[in-house]
From Swiss-Prot:
Biased composition (Low complexity): 22-31
Domain LOB intervals: 35-136
Region (Disordered): 1-31
Protein name: LOB domain-containing protein 22
Family listed: Belongs to the LOB domain-containing protein family.
InterPro entries named among the record's database cross-references: LOB
PROSITE patterns: LOB
Classification lineage: Eukaryota, Viridiplantae, Streptophyta, Embryophyta, Tracheophyta
Organism from which the protein derives: Arabidopsis thaliana (Mouse-ear cress)
Amino acid sequence: MPSGKPSSVFPLHPKPTPLKPSSSTSSSNNNSTNQACAACKYQRRKCAPDCLLAPYFPHDRHRQFLNAHKLFGVSNITKIIKSLTPPEKDAAMHTIMFQSDARANDPVDGCYGIIKKLQYQIEYTRNELEIVLQQLAMFRDRAHQHHHQEPHIQMQEQEDLSSFSSSCDLNNNNSIPYNYPLNHIQEPNQQQYCSSGNNFSGLQEDMWCLQLQDSSTIVNMKAGFIDECEDVKPVEEVSSERHEFEPHEAFVEQRKLDLPSAQYIISS
């Protein structure tokens, strides 16, 4: 007996539900999403499929929309981009967002502050480039002058060497010959000795005479004199007065015996 229960009342496997479109789809599918753009959310209205501000102010750019709305206003922005082509619309919206963000960061200067900073950087870089170019020109001039002065310097050095060699030749010609008798030139010490020795001229004549005799005779005479005279006066007691030469044999012998004392006096 067939049962009267329908088979479709309690299905064994439920049917899959369709997926909702994601938020990254085109603007035509934005109305099917639960999140509206930042402009529509601020105005508390439903985001239309042809919303002009939805591509530029999505729901996660609420702060940027507030900056643009505070500076320009939603109605003015819509009027600006309404009659523009898509490339021009993108450029206009990029400019509006940049200017509004700059005003929010710097309420006094805004974009003008950024322009001043860029102009200062340009001027500083231009001055630095000018200084570098001046230094390069200076170094090039120095290198050019040095390159042209090298032959002149070499010629001047050769002239100096030739003049120096000629002056040396003249000095050598005017100098004393190597075979000139040097004994004719008296040194100052020798001249002083000759002048001071005039007081002992008589004694020097006797010394030269005594040096010509035999040394053995002098030794023998000295020994005999020591035997005869035991008390010999020291050298300091010898009188420095000059005695006149007396050609007497006994006096000559006495002067011969006084040879050591005379040599000591002259050496002192």
